[in-house]
Amino acid sequence: MNREEKSEIIQSVAEKLSKAQGVYLTEFSGLTVSEISDLRKQFREKDIEYKVVKNTLIKKALAHTKISDKLADGLKNTTAVAFGYDDPIAPAKIIKKYSDGNEKLKFKMASVDGTIFEAGQLDQLSNMLSKTENIGRIAGTINNVISGVPGTVNAVMRNLVSALEQIAKQKAA
């Protein structure tokens, strides 16, 4: 690979790193071609890009981004990067599920919305709610509040009418 090709790769990886909300470093040594293909398929289904890139090129690309240099600590051995653009948690869920069934895939580090997560924190990451799940929860909460408002207003009106009727009866008596 000549200097120009390396420069293009560095620029491309830097763009991906900047666009991604979640960047995950994995070690894949020992995985067969079919296992890597299966893993890539799972990532593609969630619109996650999974690329094998040389550590030195990733390190140089990181220098062109706002991602913490601490992520470079995970650049040892073979490295593949998962770029989560829309949902920063989705890659963690896939990596966790896949590595539970195949110990050859190892989670190294991640940067999720600027926060660095280390190897031992994959469970914590994978248990977080995804963006879609959070939106669903918020929408459900808002819906519950909105649907409760008419009942509350009706109860207040009913109590007011009842109180006015009692006052009218007392004055009539």
Curated annotation (Swiss-Prot):
GO terms for molecular function: large ribosomal subunit rRNA binding; structural constituent of ribosome. Keywords: Ribonucleoprotein, Ribosomal protein, RNA-binding, rRNA-binding. GO terms for cellular component: large ribosomal subunit. InterPro entries: Ribosomal_uL10 (IPR001790), Ribosomal_uL10-like_sf (IPR043141), Ribosomal_uL10_bac (IPR022973), Ribosomal_uL10_bac_type (IPR047865), Ribosomal_uL10_CS_bac (IPR002363). It comes from the Bacteria. Coiled coil: none annotated. GO terms for biological process: translation. HAMAP family: Ribosomal_uL10. PANTHER family: 39S RIBOSOMAL PROTEIN L10, MITOCHONDRIAL (PTHR11560). Forms part of the ribosomal stalk, playing a central role in the interaction of the ribosome with GTP-bound translation factors. Belongs to the universal ribosomal protein uL10 family. Part of the ribosomal stalk of the 50S ribosomal subunit. The N-terminus interacts with L11 and the large rRNA to form the base of the stalk. The C-terminus forms an elongated spine to which L12 dimers bind in a sequential fashion forming a multimeric L10(L12)X complex. NCBIfam families: PRK00099.1-1. This is Large ribosomal subunit protein uL10. It comes from Chloroherpeton thalassium (strain ATCC 35110 / GB-78).
